[in-house]
UniProtKB/Swiss-Prot annotation:
Protein name: Chalcone synthase 1
Taxonomic source organism: Oryza sativa subsp. japonica (Rice)
Self-association state and partner proteins as the record states: Homodimer.
Function in brief: The primary product of this enzyme is 4,2',4',6'-tetrahydroxychalcone (also termed naringenin-chalcone or chalcone) which can under specific conditions spontaneously isomerize into naringenin.
Acyltransferase is among the record's keywords: yes
Keyword Transferase carried by entry: yes
Gene that this sequence comes from: CHS1
Pathway note: Secondary metabolite biosynthesis; flavonoid biosynthesis
Length: 398
């Protein structure tokens, strides 16, 4: 009788050989585009707050300093007129918000996922795992289930739903997708972040200026990636390899960013020194990730940093002595889309690989080999993903 297979042999056969690789990226936004220059007038009019003249001036200054040119929002004037409680500062409105997001979050995620699947070019039946992340509402079965049904994925696709993580979670999604791809030979993971500000939109208040910071920064968007190890390069085109991924809670940062789901929707609280807390700890995060690789020149790597706001980017740049062009892709996404929470870093990855090809760089990482992706959010939590670019071949810009 043949000897039984050992557990070690089973594990070896289950694991992939190479690192997890980003094989495709897709992004989507609602059709409704909001220009930042016009937003203070619109916001105070739609929330019936035009009598708050001084507060409006403060909000205008927030918008002017945001370095955001435009954002996309599912909430149109018509929707807000139909839901006046969402326009008040603190009126019960969770049901109305939930009714919107449980439909629109999976729908926007589907639009991004379809683009990623089209670029990947393989049958949907090859998708083995689905990771879905949103901070916009909660439902059961979740947005992961809804998306799997909408896309016609196999009923035995392995799903993971992440609710209420916040702005660091684009990094979390990649970390989880990496582990799934590397520990399941042949796995192809569809990872989706979909965020809609219908949960956080509310009128202004003199007593809650940090809520107004959110009103000045947040936008809607969804992004999707296909992740897998050992790509079949006859039919799959790698974009970035994920070399390591880690998460940490910053010291002395409790309460710096909070979100609470209440009858009034998702309330947002922000301490003033979030940029300082992040910049103070950024060198340690970089050192932990790159010292094993013998890298200590932070201008020699490409950067994908969650653009929580311009002050975070400014202080990180100053702390580690970054050249301005290192954050070019990051600042472009902040300018053109605002802070889309978890989806931002995937938008930036997409922008980076496209711009690298258009500008004639040798690699998907602006001509550099190694790069870092940072997620920053409630906790304060920092996600750090070490990336390796791939060479750009002829036609890769298409």
């Amino acid at each position: 009788m043949a000897a039984a297979v050992t557990v070690e042999e089973v594990r070896r056969a289950q694991r992939a050989e190479g690192p997890a690789t980003v094989l495709a990226i897709g992004t989507a936004t609602p059709a409704n585009c909001v220009y930042q220059a016009d937003y203070p007038d619109y916001y105070f009019r739609i929330t019936k707050s035009e009598h708050m003249v001084e507060l409006k001036e403060k909000f205008k200054r927030m918008c002017d300093k945001s370095q955001i040119r435009k954002r996309y929002m599912h909430l149109t004037e018509e929707i807000l007129q139909e839901n006046p409680n969402m326009c008040a500062y603190m009126a019960p409105s969770l049901d109305a918000r939930q009714d919107i997001v449980v439909v629109e979050v999976p729908k926007l995620g589907k639009a991004a996922a379809q683009k990623a699947i089209k670029e990947w070019g393989q049958p949907r039946s090859r998708i083995t795992h689905l990771v879905f992340c949103t901070t916009s509402g909660v439902d059961m079965p979740g947005a992961d289930y809804q998306l799997a049904k909408m896309l016609g994925l196999r009923p035995n696709v392995n799903r993971l739903m992440m609710y209420q993580q916040g702005c660091f979670a684009g990094g979390t999604v990649l970390r989880v997708a990496k582990d799934l791809a590397e520990n399941n030979r042949g796995a192809r993971v569809l990872a989706v972040c979909s965020e809609i500000t219908a949960v956080t939109f509310r009128g202004p208040s003199e007593s809650h200026l940090d809520s107004m910071v959110g009103q000045a920064l947040f936008g809607d968007g969804a992004a999707a990636v296909i992740v897998g190890s050992d790509p079949d390069e006859a039919v799959e085109r790698p974009l970035f390899q994920m070399v390591s991924a880690s998460q940490t809670i910053l010291p002395d940062s409790e309460g710096a960013i909070d979100g609470h789901l209440r009858e009034v929707g998702l309330t947002f609280h922000l301490l003033k020194d979030v940029p300082g807390l992040i910049s103070k700890n950024i060198e340690r995060a970089l050192g932990d990730a790159f010292t094993p690789l013998g890298i200590s020149d932070w201008n020699s790597i490409f950067w994908v940093a969650h653009p929580g706001g311009p002050a975070i980017l400014d202080q990180v740049e100053a702390k580690v002595g970054l050249d301005k062009e290192r954050m070019r892709a990051t600042r472009h996404v902040l300018s053109e889309y605002g802070n889309m929470s978890s989806a931002c870093v995937l938008f930036i990855l997409d922008e980076m690989r496209k711009r690298s090809a258009e500008d004639g760089h040798a690699t998907t990482g602006e001509g550099m080999d190694w790069g870092v992706l940072f997620g920053f959010g409630p906790g304060l939590t920092v996600e750090t993903v070490v990336l390796h670019s791939v060479p750009i071949t002829a036609g890769a810009a298409a």
